[in-house]
Structure formats: C-alpha cells, structure tokens
C-alpha cells in the first residue's frame, strides 16, 4: 500500500501548529461551556476586560511557537540557558533576520522567539498580579496564584527540556502542562467576563 510519503517522514511545523491549535480551541470551547453550566457568580468587581484576554492570547501565541519548536526539533539546539551559546541572541544568526519572512523557518530563531515570549508572558503575569492586589480584587487572588504556580512549573519544565536536549519525557510534560495553563487562563478570563 502506498503511504503517500515522498522521502520525507517529518510533519510540517505549520501543519503541526494548526493541528495543535484546533485541539486547543476545541478544549477552550468545551471548558467555557462547562464553566457556563457551573453558574459561577460573576457579580464581583473586575479588571479591565482586555487584561485577561491579552494573557490568554499570549499563551496561545506561545503554544503556536512551541509547536514550531517541536516540529523543527529546535529544542535540540542551543541547549543552554539563559544564553544561546555564548550570547543572548543565537550565534548562528543576525538580529535583522527576526524581521524577515523566513524567520519561522529557522530553528534557532524559533527557539529565540519561544524563549523570549516566555519572558513576556511572565512579565505580563506580574503586571496582572500587581493590578489585582493593588485594587484588592479578592475574587482573583486564588485564580491568579494557580496560574502563577502552573506558569512557574511550565517555565521550569521548559528550561529543563532545553538543557536536556528535548528528552521526550520532559517535552511531553512541558506540553501537557500547557493544557493546565490554558484552562486556568480561561477560568480567569471567564471570571472577568459577563457571560450568561
């Protein structure tokens, strides 16, 4: 039986990302409907509507870039942290290349994006924590701590996955944890919504 493969047995990282995102969108819609069925009280003081949404969008962007890393085996290069080799930017590239259309076909640049988007997400998380505690939004104290715990685990797993050359057990745990990060971020977004 012809398999349809033509000397290439790996999957396009773009197709892998689309496949993964569809799965996460299905998970998100299902979990959102589940939250609606729980009749959670939403009559509390809220953050500005876009703040949790931006966090969730950043997480989805990171999942997309993570799929690129996985599909290109970009986790098997530059197995050091916090530097990529001997510098912050990958040694085998030029900074100008991040602005080109081919940037997402370059494993070292994809890894660079994945690392730095993690830093952006962490900083944005700290901004959310500051806003929640500054405004004494008690209803958000527990959810934001849960997100923080999952985010911390995800970052540690990401670093160890990198340092150990993307061993399958570490990479799998890193990917599984993203499910919990998306779910907790969705719950946070739901708490801040006016959903009926």
Where are the regions a protein language model picked out?
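Polytopic transmembrane helical bundles with strong interfacial aromatic enrichment
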Residues: 1-196
């Amino acid at each position: 039986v012809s398999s349809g493969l033509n000397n290439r047995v790996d999957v396009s990282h773009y197709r892998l990302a689309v496949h993964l995102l569809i799965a996460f969108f299905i998970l998100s819609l299902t979990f959102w409907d589940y939250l609606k069925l729980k009749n959670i009280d939403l009559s509390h003081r809220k953050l500005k509507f876009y703040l949790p949404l931006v966090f969730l969008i950043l997480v989805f962007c990171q999942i997309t870039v993570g799929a690129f890393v996985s599909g290109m085996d970009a986790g098997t290069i530059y197995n050091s942290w916090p530097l990529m080799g001997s510098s912050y930017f990958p040694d085998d590239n030029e900074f100008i290349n991040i602005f080109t259309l081919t940037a997402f076909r370059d494993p070292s640049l994809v890894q660079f994006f994945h690392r730095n988007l993690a830093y952006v997400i962490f900083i944005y998380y700290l901004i959310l924590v500051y806003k929640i505690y500054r405004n004494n939004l008690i209803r958000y104290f527990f959810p934001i701590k849960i997100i923080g715990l999952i985010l911390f685990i995800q970052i540690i797993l990401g670093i160890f996955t990198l340092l150990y050359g993307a061993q399958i057990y570490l990479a799998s745990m890193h990917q599984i944890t993203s499910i919990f990060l998306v779910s907790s971020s969705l719950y946070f977004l739901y708490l801040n919504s006016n959903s009926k």
